[in-house]
Amino acid sequence: MDPVVLTARSVLCEPGRWIEGGGLVLHGGRVRAVLDSPGAVARAGLTLRDLGDVLLTPGLVNAHAHLELGTLAGALPPDEGFVAWVEALIASKAHDGDEDFARAVAVGAERLLAGGTTCVGDVDSTGAAGEVCGGGGLRARIYHEVLDAGDERRTAGALERLSNRPAGGAGRYEGIAPHAPYTVSPTLLAACGKLQRESGQACSIHWAETEEEAHWMERGEGEFARLLNHSPGVRGLDAIEAAGLLGAGTSLVHANHTAPGERERIARAGAVVVHCPGTHEFFGRSPFDFRAWMEAGVNLALGTDSLASNDDLDMRKEMALVRASAGLEPADVWSMATLGGARAVGLAGSVGALVEGAWADLVAWPWSGGGPAAALDALTAGELRPVAVLISGHPLREGDA
């Protein structure tokens, strides 16, 4: 297929790069050049594909989801606390089968696309995500989840799952997800670290989500004793670092309860912290300290988590929650939902920005005009609904969001 120039009224390539009357050269599913003026478009001499009065942006990147848990939407209230919620999740999930999980992933992928998300970091414990994601649809980093709850009898099975994880495919990238330092034994965590070093695949791990986690990790105390048998006797971040997993290829999900100096350690290591605003609100947690993380120099990303702890899979809502709760600049919030997410899933330069060499994963939003400040304000307030979503330059949704 010959190169084409995709034009629109305005293009937000990334925060700080705004184009009026220009366009993007697309070829082979990627952005081959950014044309910053009508004159540059004319000089390109290529076939034009004009989207009209729209604002063109990169697709949003959902850095943390559990699409398979769509089977539990609205079924698990948080009233009795986090550990009780986990117990209910385990019991409820046991009643679902492969078809249920596959259906949940497919429906979840459609919901993400409808809200302008074109790439997701999806934690997969059932194998369902690999059957649905990619292949010209939603782009996905599929994190294959393992845990053994400190039970050596389960470690071998978890290691086998890691060694037998499928290869990536079109629009699908494989990753590793040791569930959390409190549910993964030192042996299994070390194996994940070794595998990440050898494969270069991205890693996602839940960390510091609740105070109960720290109580269990360090002292073997608290409600986690109902679920687990052996406390590691160390802080979670120390366990992650000892396994070789504290680095640029790792996403630390939640990060709500930290000790002095841990933010700086994470910044030096280059790991990404993923905040899930909807889940945070679901459990009624204290405000997430965005500014402390930003001042420490940590890369931040946003995720929806699952429908078991959120009422939607809409990154527009997640951005709006951050705006309402933290009072951050719209450009910073947009960066978390695009550039930050791309770093989290290990696809920086390929998704999350409209730059030369990136995949042409684009969203067109209705736009009557205005500058970048107005655009970022509207985008991060959740005021706009996509009119078209493209993956690798091919329309997937038009006018039905």
Q: Each predicted region: which residue ranges?
A:
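Active-site beta-loop-alpha junctions enriched in small/polar residues
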Residues: 66, 125-126, 145-149, 179-181, ...
